[in-house]
């Protein structure tokens, strides 16, 4: 989304806007393996593309226009230098085994990543981070780093496995993650190092790496949104999908699923690990129909969602205090809604946000997000007053009603 007229084309403008909204930190995929892993992929002339056809156009995260070429390393250091100029912190992360390569014109980046054996990926990541951090320091940019996150959502990515992460993987991958974090801590002891979970192991928090220096987790409560997913069978496969219920949530111009599927570049689905059925539902979502369903059914799930927020924040807070490290919610609160849906940006979504942020503050969390629908490429970015009030409340406090 860095092309002309796209949201991230002018990085200085983006940073000015986030400061205006009360933010002081950004979190990015710094692509450490691509830039410092000797993959043989030309990162200095990385061609950016859409996922093919209309795929991703109705989502909040998979809709770059493409058609541009980026010198990724130059772009990274431009951003870090601007962050230093603006006094903005940067959380360095990697989405390389989850989404980032899907927006490349070719599969070269993704293929090179997948050629690394799963059992070696955490170690390779750590080695690449070590080299990247050395260069960041050499350029005088060390002080903009809030902390280093080994990889985004290890449990919802391909960083440790080829396929879905199972319950046993929480234990099986713990040592590999601890070794990787240990390598980083040894090489760069002046920085904080951690990893992140998409669905934190709330019942088994001991499976999280014990040497993490930040308890970084994501908290999507879903609740009523999960009920919509279940009702519509959003993850079903043809011929069951799309169900009549799902069709009732689509625009009249939605093509049949087979026609839609023919437009996608198949390898990009492997790179995103996102079901095509979800992308289809988002790309052709009737936003009003989605929102009407969510509002009609919210009362059935309100208590469950609030309790879910309380329980999960408490589990994360307890772990962080036992280990003497700060706690951060790096993504959240409701879940992945189509771009056409305004539920999370509306009064109920804002109420959920306020409840979660107040709860996190009462538990002494170090950092939170206003919501994962608040970024320059989201419609909610235009609501300056809401973001500013939430950020000021987290920093300065408030009393729960």
Regions found by a protein language model. Give the residues of each.
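Short beta-strand and adjacent tight-turn residues that come in two discontinuous sequence segments
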Residues: 28, 217, 370
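Extracellular glycoside hydrolase catalytic/binding regions
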Residues: 130, 134, 140, 147, ...
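Hydrophobic anchor at the start of a short beta-strand
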Residues: 90, 327, 367
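Aromatic-rich peripheral "rim/lid" segments of glycoside hydrolase catalytic domains that contact
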Residues: 49-52, 339-401
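Short, loop-centered acidic/histidine patches that primarily coordinate divalent metals
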Residues: 27, 330-335, 372-373
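Active-site mouth of glycoside hydrolases
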Residues: 1-209, 243, 374-376, 390-391, ...
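A generic membrane alpha-helix/interface feature
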Residues: 40, 47, 105, 234-236, ...
């Amino acid at each position: 989304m860095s092309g002309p007229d796209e949201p991230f084309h002018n990085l200085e403008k983006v940073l000015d806007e986030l400061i205006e909204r009360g933010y002081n930190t950004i979190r990015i995929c710094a692509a450490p393996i691509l830039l410092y892993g000797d993959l043989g992929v030309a990162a200095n002339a990385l061609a950016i593309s859409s996922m093919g056809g209309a795929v991703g156009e109705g989502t909040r995260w998979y809709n770059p226009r493409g058609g541009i070429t980026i010198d990724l390393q130059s772009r990274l250091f431009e951003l870090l230098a601007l962050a230093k100029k603006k006094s903005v912190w940067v959380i360095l992360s990697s989405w390389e085994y989850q989404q980032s390569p899907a927006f490349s014109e070719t599969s070269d980046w993704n293929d090179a990543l997948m050629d690394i054996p799963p059992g070696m990926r955490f170690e390779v990541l750590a080695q690449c981070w070590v080299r990247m951090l050395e260069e960041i320091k050499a350029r005088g940019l060390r002080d903009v780093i809030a902390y280093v996150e080994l990889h985004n959502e290890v449990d919802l990515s391909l960083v440790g496995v080829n396929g879905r992460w199972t319950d046993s993987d929480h234990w099986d991958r713990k040592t590999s993650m601890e070794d990787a974090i240990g390598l980083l801590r040894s090489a760069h002891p002046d920085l904080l190092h951690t990893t992140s979970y998409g669905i934190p192991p709330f019942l088994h928090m001991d499976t999280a790496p014990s040497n993490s220096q930040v308890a970084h987790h994501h908290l999507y409560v879903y609740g009523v949104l999960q009920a919509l997913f279940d009702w519509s069978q959003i993850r079903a496969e043809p011929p069951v999908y799309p169900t009549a219920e799902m069709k009732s949530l689509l625009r009249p111009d939605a093509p049949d699923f087979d026609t839609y599927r023919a437009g996608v570049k198949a390898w990009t689905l492997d790179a995103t690990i996102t079901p095509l059925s979800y992308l289809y539902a988002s790309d052709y979502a009737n936003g009003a129909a989605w929102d009407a369903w969510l509002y009609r059914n919210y009362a059935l799930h309100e208590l469950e969602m609030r309790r879910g927020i309380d329980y999960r924040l408490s589990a994360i807070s307890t772990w962080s205090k036992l280990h003497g490290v700060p706690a951060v919610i790096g993504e959240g609160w409701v879940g992945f809604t189509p771009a056409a849906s305004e539920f999370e940006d509306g009064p109920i979504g804002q109420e959920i946000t306020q409840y979660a942020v107040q709860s996190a503050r009462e538990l002494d969390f170090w950092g939170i997000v206003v919501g994962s629908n608040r970024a320059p490429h989201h419609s909610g970015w235009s609501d300056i007053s809401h973001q500013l009030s939430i950020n000021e409340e987290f920093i300065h406090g408030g009393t729960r009603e």
